[in-house]
Regions:
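Structural alpha/beta surface segment adjacent to cysteine/selenocysteine redox centers
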Residues: 16-118
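C-terminal cap of thioredoxin/glutaredoxin-like
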Residues: 2-3, 7-29, 34, 102, ...
């Protein structure tokens, strides 16, 4: 089983979210989507991210732009980096993923595309309403649902859980309960781990 801890506000997570789905399908693996708030992780265990954003190393920042563009091209995705609003408050979008449960994938896909592909501010209710309409979700039920305390509590619990298990960002991916991987570029290693597990179970 794969657990995919994610926040739609991360470009590398957009890539991994897109790229892991055909891998899971190909190998017949089960995947559990675990929405989180990456800002909550940074505040707890990785606050240096904020300093790096304030004072980026120019050469590294320039290469990161190229690296992201290369990966996006490879995945067939459009990514605008940085978006007009960056970082973005993704809390309502991620609560939406929690509220939708097992039906979250079309919504999460549209949130990723709206933010990273279309440069829309996913913190805004009007943008989220537009996404709901696109994927066939009742807007009123959506906004009522993301206001439920149980939904808020689950998002917080997921975020605390990934930190407790050693995570420090998004995407954090587990194969089994303890084999942790971080980032889009670890997917070849995840493939190998899944194949090893398949072989040992045979």
């Amino acid at each position: 089983m794969i657990e995919f801890f994610f926040d739609c506000s991360s470009p590398w997570t957009y890539l991994a979210f897109h790229n892991i789905q055909p891998l899971v399908k190909e190998l017949g693996a089960e995947i559990v989507w675990r929405p989180i708030l990456v800002g909550g992780i940074f505040n707890t265990v990785n606050p240096s991210v904020y300093a790096q954003r304030e004072k980026p190393v120019p050469l590294k920042a320039r290469y990161m732009q190229k690296d992201l563009a290369d990966w996006a091209r490879s995945a067939g995705l459009a990514i605008k980096m940085p978006p007009t609003v960056f970082p973005v408050n993704s809390v309502k979008a991620m609560r939406g993923c929690i509220w939708l449960g097992k039906d979250m994938v079309p919504f999460a896909t549209s949130v990723f595309e709206a933010y990273w592909g279309d440069d829309k501010d996913i913190s805004q209710d009007a943008v989220l309403a537009e996404i709901c309409k696109k994927v066939g979700i009742d807007e009123q039920k959506f906004f009522a649902g993301i206001s439920e305390q149980a939904v808020k509590d689950q998002l917080k619990a997921n975020t605390e859980e990934v930190v407790a298990r050693g995570g420090f960002g998004s995407p954090t991916i587990f194969v089994g309960k303890t084999d942790m991987y971080f980032g889009n570029d670890r997917l070849p290693l995840i493939r190998e781990a899944l194949l090893r597990n398949k072989a040992s179970a045979a």
